[in-house]
Swiss-Prot record:
Family: Belongs to the tRNA(Ile)-lysidine synthase family.
Listed name of the protein: tRNA(Ile)-lysidine synthase
Record field: catalytic activity: cytidine(34) in tRNA(Ile2) + L-lysine + ATP = lysidine(34) in tRNA(Ile2) + AMP + diphosphate + H(+)
Pfam families in the cross-refs: ATP_bind_3
InterPro entries per UniProt: Rossmann-like_a/b/a_fold, TilS/TtcA_N, tRNA_Ile_lys_synt, tRNA_Ile_lys_synt_N
Functional summary from the UniProt entry: Ligates lysine onto the cytidine present at position 34 of the AUA codon-specific tRNA(Ile) that contains the anticodon CAU, in an ATP-dependent manner. Cytidine is converted to lysidine, thus changing the amino acid specificity of the tRNA from methionine to isoleucine.
Record GO terms (molecular function): ATP binding; tRNA(Ile)-lysidine synthase activity
Amino acid sequence: MIGDVLPTTPNESPNWHRLRRAIRSTWPNRHGRSSDVATLVGCSGGADSVALICLLAELWAEESNGLNPANETVTKPVAPLVVAHCNHGLRGEESNADEAFVRQICDQLQLPLVIHHVPPLNNSATSGPVSDERTLRQIRRDFFERAAKQHGCRYVAVAHSADDQAETMLHHFIRGTGPLGLAGIAEASELDTDIVVRRPLLQVRRDTLRDGLREIGQPWREDASNRHTIYTRNWIRHDVLPLIESRYPNAVEAIHRAGTLQHEMNEMVRRLAERWLEAFTDFSGDRWTIHTERLSKSATPEKRMDDTNAACSWMIERPVIVAASQLAWDRLGWSRGSMTMQHWQRLTGLINDQSCWHTSDIDVSTSQAVDGIDHGGHFPGGICLSVEAKQLVLRSE
């Protein structure tokens, strides 16, 4: 544990004061108050999440106190602020000590706490660190969703920092990610229909958060497994990013800017993709139908050859059709986990291939695989493309 005392009153130390301003500028404000929406805060006990719950607790406390017309101090109602801690149990007593530490903070701040104990996985505490980062993230995500619904929370606040953003984007880049991955972590994203994940510290450096905690004497826990470079994220954090920063000191800020610009581009493509879905497709049950006649009339061969005709050419652009297809997958609840960029490009090629459009009632899903890759209408997750009455139909088998 880093530090040795807990703060008892709001602190005006320079770094902490800047962090308080930062949280106010990024947290949603409804009618002049940020504390009107019930919020669940994820806290591991590490520095970033400890800083987040302390900052939000101060914000809630400030907004709960005010003056009435007689200039008397009164307490104003605020929405619930709930802390959630997921105990994976992977580090034995250390994991339990993390839980006890988070409970201590919540007791001092008088915040309700909900804890999830994860059942033992196939990787026990004695068999070394768990390397399946995706599984651990999904466990936490599912827990946060359940806890938010249980406590009526609209927002789930998590403590991703600017360093997390840079590490994520580098990880995505070396894996050959698409445009969505190059945008990195979003400041807000949907967890469920009525639940939004918010990341108010996404523009704050990790060292800045630690400096602020030191100024106010607030301790935090250090997870020894964060040093294990068996985790790709830790390898990027401890080896790759420091090497980059040794040559480019402002690399984290530059990567963050690049992600912001990519996000803006993605939003433009998404809007075009939604227009494409509305104009050329229909959904019925587990079927997605692409009306080729509509697409053909809007993008004739003459218009396709005219590069200056941007009003029509966007309809056949691969990024737009890929984005539209991904939206369709999400709308139908189909998993995109095994869909690679090669799959999306193949689907786009079939959609744009007019020779497929005029193949009457022939299932194009019976193609042969070449070099282990199906070049026809079969896609991961049991999704099949066929031609029915000159329409392209995708369905779950």
